[in-house]
Amino acid sequence: MAEGETESPRPKKCGPYISSVTSQSVNVVIRGVVLFFIGVFLALVLNLLQIQRNVTLFPPDVITSIFSSAWWVPPCCGTASAVIGLLYPCIDRHLGEPHKFKREWSSVMRCVAVFVGINHASAKVDFDNNFQFSLTLAALSVGLWWTFDRSRSGFGLGVGIAFLATVVTQLLVYNGVYQYTSPDFLYVRSWLPCIFFAGGITMGNIGRQLAMYECKVIAEKSHQE
């Protein structure tokens, strides 16, 4: 190359650490948005199932009236779903125990189907008493965890989510923020913890699968570079 010629300036590349952090942050935001909309969708679907039994977490006209007293329930469910879905893989990494049991999308879809089925059963099946109903739902919820999760961290988080969500829900009801459309409050209270537990396991599985897919994409990009 002649001395008079000058090299054209090349675009500066970010360091690998900055690039990695930026990529991870964007991926976390994308996963959070996806989980949020999944949570909103499931909240609306499950509410339609519960309408069959006249037991809903928000009035049936919530979509038609933006001034409904519980219009905020679906967004809250979406936010909780995003937090849970991001928390599960984070806890797995923190404990150094990556979840590898049934890590494919077909298993996740079956988990979602079983979760919806449990909710459908709670709306359709009649039991002699609330204790029998609660025991059946508890067995189904634990069966969902055993079939699609089997991790100690998943079970512990599921129990914690069920307890916290049930307490928050009852506090909102007691304070008159919103109320159930069914007069049988004991019936509602009997299935809430089981549904919250199964919902936590389901969203945790979705979050883990999204995180694993993200890791695969990042690994493929690093190999190409």
Curated annotation (Swiss-Prot):
InterPro entries recorded: INSIG_fam
Subunit organization: Interacts with SCAP; interaction is direct and only takes place in the presence of sterols; it prevents interaction between SCAP and the coat protein complex II (COPII). Associates with the SCAP-SREBP complex (composed of SCAP and SREBF1/SREBP1 or SREBF2/SREBP2); association is mediated via its interaction with SCAP and only takes place in the presence of sterols. Interacts with RNF139. Interacts with RNF145.
Membrane association type: Multi-pass membrane protein
GO molecular function, one term: protein sequestering activity
Chain positions found as Cysteine sulfenic acid (-SOH): 215
Tissue specificity as recorded in UniProt: Expressed in liver, testis, kidney, spleen, intestine, brain and adrenal gland.
Transmembrane feature ranges: 29-51, 71-88, 104-126, 130-148, 154-175, 190-207
Cross-link (Glycyl cysteine thioester (Cys-Gly) (interchain with G-Cter in ubiquitin)) at residue(s): 215
Disruption phenotype: Knockout mice with a conditional deletion of Insig1 in the liver and a germline deletion of Insig2 overaccumulate cholesterol and triglycerides in liver: despite this accumulation, levels of nuclear sterol regulatory element-binding proteins (SREBPs) are not reduced. The amount of HMGCR is also elevated, caused by impaired degradation of the enzyme. Knockout mice with a germline deletion of both Insig1 and Insig2 die within one day of birth.
Domain-level remarks: Binds oxysterols in a pocket within their transmembrane domains and interacts with SCAP via transmembrane domains 3 and 4. The KxHxx motif mediates association with the coatomer complex.
Sites bearing Phosphoserine, chain numbering: 151
Cellular compartment(s): Endoplasmic reticulum membrane
Residues annotated as site: Required for the recognition of 25-hydroxycholesterol: 115
Full protein name: Insulin-induced gene 2 protein
Residue interval(s) of motif KxHxx: 219-225
Database matches in PANTHER family: INSULIN-INDUCED GENE 1, INSULIN-INDUCED GENE 2 PROTEIN
Cellular-component GO terms for this entry: SREBP-SCAP-Insig complex
GO biological process: cholesterol biosynthetic process; cholesterol metabolic process; cranial suture morphogenesis; inner ear morphogenesis; middle ear morphogenesis; negative regulation of fatty acid biosynthetic process; negative regulation of steroid biosynthetic process; response to fatty acid
Chain ranges on the Lumenal side, renumbered to this chain: 52-70, 127-129, 176-189
Cytoplasmic compartment spans: 1-28, 89-103, 149-153, 208-225
